[in-house]
Amino acid sequence: MFCLRQLSPRKHHISFLLVLLLSLWLVEPLLAGPAIMPLSQVKPGMKGIGKSVFAGQSIQEFNVEIIGILENVQPKQNWILARLTGQGLENTGVVAGMSGSPVYIDGKIVGSVSFSYAFSKEAIAGITPIEEMLAIGGQKVPPRTGVSQPVNWLNMPATLEQLGSAYLNWSQQVGETASYDRSLVPIKVPLVFSGFSTRAFNSFKSILAGDNFQPVLGSRMAAGQTLNLSIPPPPAISEGQAVGVQLMGGDLDLTAVGTVTYVDGEKILAFGHSFYNLGTVDYGLTRAEILTVVPSLESSFKLATTGELIGRISQDRTTGVLGEIGRYPRYVPVNIEIQDNLIRKKQFKLKVVNDPILTPALLNAGLSTLIGAEERSYGNLSLDFEASFVLERGQIVHLEDLFSGNFDNPTTSLSSLVAAVSYLLNNNEFQPVKISQIDLKIRSVEEIRQASLEKVLLDKYAVAPGELVTARVYFRTFNNEVKTEEVEFTVPPLPAGSEVELVVAEAAYMQQLERSLYRVQDFTPRNIDQLLRLLSNLRKNNRIYFKLLASRPGLFLKGEEWPDVPPGYKAMLTSPRAATANLTEIDRSTLSEYQLPVPYVFKGAITVPIKIKK
């Protein structure tokens, strides 16, 4: 038989606290944000309000009338179709920058204004249901590592310039955008380019903007953020407020502007559709101020300025973005020095988001813009540079080269090269790599510095093994001056009567020669260390390369030449049982190599035979 027993005052107090804590835990999700109206309760004909900023930072209301429900417009996704009025929307239509504007019925949040029709005569919008946006916060996804499949455009590049060109051609193909007809599409997001020249803006807006964006040449707030790491306490954020998603900061700024849909403590939901739809990300979250709404037949848009950094965007999903106030992104700092005479130097600082896809594109746009602003965009130009990529684990990839030509070719070559190296590091197939810092020193002159090989003369053409030979190289500069350089080398100990060849050439010719020697068309690194060596050792434009070749069998394995392989070891490697991948038997081996720096982009190739005395 059960009987009641009176609890002691202490036990009664503990039990009461447990019940209270359990109750608070159960109701906490309901108290975290505004009340929600589920999609099942939304009916055609219902009327409500939306919130957005149309001028300044003041949140204003507009009218919303539900037209109907569009079910399964995308897998497991529904949209609410609505007509918007008020705040001039009858004349402007749905405005780019309204993405994320929250919609309320009977004081309960329904979702966010996210989609529209191009060239529509009325402000007809698609609303993303709030339940689908809230699902973003529940996704537990690890950060994107950048480890990916081998890059198919890296086909044994001969020079740094060719590597940059390969990336540029690939990125332009990737950047091609689709066209929309009469479908309901994401509302365009104003992407504000601050500090960019008109020419740079026109060059990069299609690559960086894509389908979901409205590129705008704008500016930051007068008291905008700096690169100072002492960030002030984050201010409060409200539903309907304008915010920015910052991709680049510093002397140039690239920030997209949208609207906050939902606030839950220090977390926010915004946009109601994807940004780039890259999943787990690390973008900046900033304040934004709307200057005005610019009416347009194609797509009216909010003209905005961006403000201080207040947090970060951590998720970029189909139904919106998730932001965290008070937590800040890990940017990649880029330090740039441009020198155009003996004493005049200018320093620039950028910070770009750390992303496998966006970082290279942002570096390309930022460097091209800064160099183009400081130096001539057209006419003769030569850029001599050094670049260092400092990695998180202490490794450094060092690049140096010279690009020379006219129009904007040198600038394009340099910026695309830095972008290419960033892409290869961030998207290597071996292990995650984080770039801690990029330092770039550029020296420019407004003239062409190119030279063509004329002839190569030796002090002797028949030599004894181990004898010293002097080679004099004659080349003609762009100004028709003939220059000479001398190099000394020692002939290896070879059998009497044999012959060696001295190849004097530019970088690109050396690649062609080695492809024919090794009978390979491409070379893919096998580990991260090999990739770092490949990038640091790529041949340069401003070098004269010397290679001594002899008819001596060897092996080419995993990107390296193995001369004088013992017969037994060679037989083991080349046997059918070994089946060693990427192994090539070669009949001519490299005895020695030299490179001579010159202040010109060097072109040409000559092969000189040398006899070994009996």
Where in the sequence are the language-model features?
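Short linear motifs in intrinsically disordered/low-complexity regions
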Residues: 13-14, 107
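N-terminal secretory signal peptides that target proteins for export/translocation
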Residues: 1-11
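Terminal presequence/propeptide segments associated with secretion/organelle targeting
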Residues: 31-614
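Compositionally biased, intrinsically disordered low-complexity segments enriched
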Residues: 8, 14-15, 33
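Bacterial N-terminal signal peptides
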Residues: 15-29
